[in-house]
Amino acid sequence: VTLAGMFFGRGMTAIISTDMISIKNELFLKWANYRFYMPFGSTNKKGKFIPAYIPPTVVIALIVVIIIAVLLKYRKFGRKLYAIGGNRQSALMMGLNVKKTMFQAYILDGFLAGLGGFLFCLNSCAGFVEQAKGLEMDAISSAVIGGTLLSGGVGTPIGTLFGVLIKGTISSLITTQGTLSSWWVR
């Protein structure tokens, strides 16, 4: 359902426009250019201090990871999701409303996909049909590296965060080294 929904959304977007659409909304651009400056940083060749910063997309993503981690670990909904992911038949026999929980999970999935698209647009300040093509496989591989089982029932958002960091580090190292073939990285 989720991949089919993605392909449907991508197709509908292609009907609207196949050109890149730059975002010119002032509030959106303020958000995109905002920085959370840190008290540390580096100096340039002239000795001028350049503070380190964190973009708002990283802050929002970290807040979402923490909220989802708490939801999955300490709330009934999260425990139901783990039970259904582990074994749907057992969850049904325990008296859990599997259909309702799955429906709620798809609602949460849709919200998080929309938020991810918003954060992606904050980074690029533009929208394009082919912009995030192939990132679904990056997301799946990062989750697996972080310890999530594709069969379900096992995995944490914090583990997935570490999977994203590990995959990003490996991709960056391969790109900057330039010693491996181009098919190793997108």
Question: Can you name each region flagged by the protein language model?
Answer:
Residues 86-87:
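Short helix-boundary/capping micro-motifs
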Residues 2-77, 101-103, 124-129, 176-185:
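Transmembrane helix-bundle core of multi-pass membrane transporters
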Residues 97-108:
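Short hydrophobic alpha-helical segments within the ABC transporter permease transmembrane module
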Residues 5-7, 64, 108, 112, ...:
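Hydrophobic residues within membrane-embedded alpha-helical segments of Major Facilitator Superfamily
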